[in-house]
Amino acid sequence: MVGSRHPDQCAKRWHHSLDPNVKRGPWTMEEDSSLLEAVQKIGRDWKEIGRELFPSRSTTDIKNRYVILSRRRGPSPAIPENCSSIDIETHSSSLADSKPPIPAELLTPEVDFSIANTPCELDSSNLAPDTLSINMTLPSDLPSYLSLPLPDTAETDHALDESSTAWEIPDWTAFDNQCLFTPGASELEGSFTSRNHEEPPQPLPVPDIPGPSTLVLEDLRPETVNLVIDTLLRTNSKFGMRMYNTGS
């Protein structure tokens, strides 16, 4: 008669929903108590419990009722084999909540916080070179070229123009000692005042010699050479320079 259904489906449908002899009404408190006691004695053999105590109820109804009662009473210490997924989740969350708190000494290692109030003494020998403050004096014959002052064209209003500065090699064979005026390093340094005092520099004493002059400077420090170049630029002098190393 029902060709689209399997015989097992028809039997289950009849037994669980259509059989008038199967009780489908609400459970009473006496039935709930009897069901819980039967599970404690017999176990979760729903067919056996149904034959002995609830012949008018289906095994599926008995099982579902026990799951509902278990959820109301709270999770049992052990997870049932035939328990639903809802019961398993409830049981797991209850076990997680019932775990004792982990001692703090297991989470955080013991630390003596009094060390934070103790002055820290560093050994400078273990520090990196760039973290030390070294106060040392360089030899006088080894000047620091990075700290040498260069002529400030913004203050002197003179720019070093390559077209007006001829880097020529003079004819040393025509050198005349009588027209040579070479002031010493102390005279050059004494004729200038540091720019920190904001005083105008004094001109160098130049002999009154007509015609071109040749100036030879030997064994000068780099800062002295800078002072000479600055003076020539200030006076708008046309000059040629040749720097060479005579060797030691």
UniProtKB/Swiss-Prot annotation:
Q: For this UniProt record, give its keywords in alphabetical order, as a comma-separated list.
A: DNA-binding, Nucleus, Transcription, Transcription regulation
Q: Does the keyword Nuclease apply?
A: no
GO cellular-component term (any): nucleus
Its BP terms in the Gene Ontology are:
cichorine biosynthetic process; mitotic cell cycle; positive regulation of transcription by RNA polymerase II
The stretch of residues making up the signal peptide is none
Applied biotechnology uses: Cichorine and its derivatives are promising in the course of developing novel herbicides.
DNA-binding region spans which residues?
46-70
What is a single Pfam family found in this protein's UniProt entry?
Answer: Myb_DNA-binding
Q: Indicate whether Kinase appears among the record's keywords.
A: no
What is the role of this chain?
Transcription factor that regulates the expression of the gene cluster that mediates the biosynthesis of cichorine, a phytotoxin active against knapweed, corn, and soybeans.
Q: What is the recorded name of this protein?
A: Transcription factor cicD
Q: What is the lineage of its organism?
A: Eukaryota, Fungi, Dikarya, Ascomycota, Pezizomycotina
